[in-house]
Amino acid sequence: MGKRKAFIDKKASQSFRLVPDNRERSERFKPTQEHLEEQQKYGVYYDDDYDYLQHMRAVNEPMKLENVHEEVEKTTIKTSGSSAFPPAPPLFGLVGALKKPEFFDEDVANALEEVTDDRNTGELEDNFITLAGGLLDERTTVYRSTRRGEDSEEEEDDDEDDEMYDDYNDDELFGEEAVGEIRVERADQRVIDNAFEELMDREYNTDQIGELDGDDYDVGGALEPNAGRLHKLINDKGPSNAEYDEELAKHYVRERMRLIEEGVIKDKEEYEIVEVDEGTNKKMKWDCESFATQYTNIYNHPTLIKEPRGLSRKALKRFDKAVEEMDIAEEDEDDDEDMEDDDDKESVFSTVSTFRPKNETPEQRSLRKKAVKEARKLRRVEKKANKTMFAEEKRKLAKGRIGQIKARPI
């Protein structure tokens, strides 16, 4: 059974979406022709029963904020003097409606006030050192300061160490050698700190210490030729172009000399004025030998062009013998060709035709075919003779070129 053609083609059809409309027929908007023209003026081309212009506002039209919350009228409820609700029933033997008298103790209140005063003020007593247990030994102070410098992030461990070492004697904890090493390290650190402070006072002012201003990002200074920062800047620049660098250097020298001549800048160096011929700048003058040496390398060895030498006596004798042998061979070939030319003077041409006459008999047909075969055979022989003759002429020309000097017209 073949495939049935669909009643509706989905690709070539239009689909519509039905949306419910809760409005009544009398409330629906019916656009007029003027309304549609005004709507198309603002780029709205929808042809439906909706007023799109109701969302349009003028540029200078003030905005008005509408309150989205519903207003609720305030209502007052009048109650009688006596309570409208009866008191709550007693719960587990306790009377909730009755209020017991509060207990007040003056000593407790004064103690609480003193505690709150101490917490709020944060002031210390005049004799807080004696209250804390007196001054500590210098060795214990040095040890604690070094330990806190190493573990500044772990405050809880520092507190535990302080409590642990308060109960022990200092002589038992530290020997004389350990205390001496701590004092030496502290002395070295103090020397470094003093040198750093002197360097800061000498190199920088108080105004130059700290973060730079908002727009002051220019940092001046001089770099050494072999400084690592200078090499890094060169590498960041990337591969340099030799021609571009040369042109940039020339431009810098020209601008600097111009400013020196105008007196804008002063230069302590002394320069010597040298006159240069203008013709040498435009085109360099080279002779053949000096110019050829500019491109000499391991692959190219330019030299002066020399005239070819003449043949030696031995070479001339060999050349004469070769010419005589070629002449003898050419004479023999010419004799053979003259004899062959006598036979080939008459060209073989076809006198028969492959066309069959209208009233041809079988005997005439067989004779005609034999004549055609004979003519084709003679034609093949003629072609072979022509091919052989052209090959011989080509060999003669090749032999004639032997010993000739190749020359090119000037």
From Swiss-Prot:
Which residue windows does the record flag with biased composition (Basic and acidic residues)? 357-366
UniProt keyword annotations, A-Z: Coiled coil
Residue ranges annotated as compositionally biased, kind Acidic residues, are: 151-165, 325-345
User: One GO BP annotation here?
Assistant: ribosomal small subunit export from nucleus
List the GO terms this entry assigns under cellular component, sorted alphabetically. Answer: cytosol; nucleus; preribosome, small subunit precursor
**Which residues does the annotated region (Disordered) include?**
142-165, 325-378
Origin: domain of life: Eukaryota
Q: Which InterPro entries match?
A: Ltv1
A Pfam family per the record: LTV
UniProt biased composition (Basic residues) = 367-378
Q: Which residues form a coiled coil?
A: 363-389
Task: Indicate the family of this protein.
Answer: Belongs to the LTV1 family.
Q: What is this protein called?
A: Protein LTV1 homolog
Q: Which organism is it from?
A: Caenorhabditis elegans
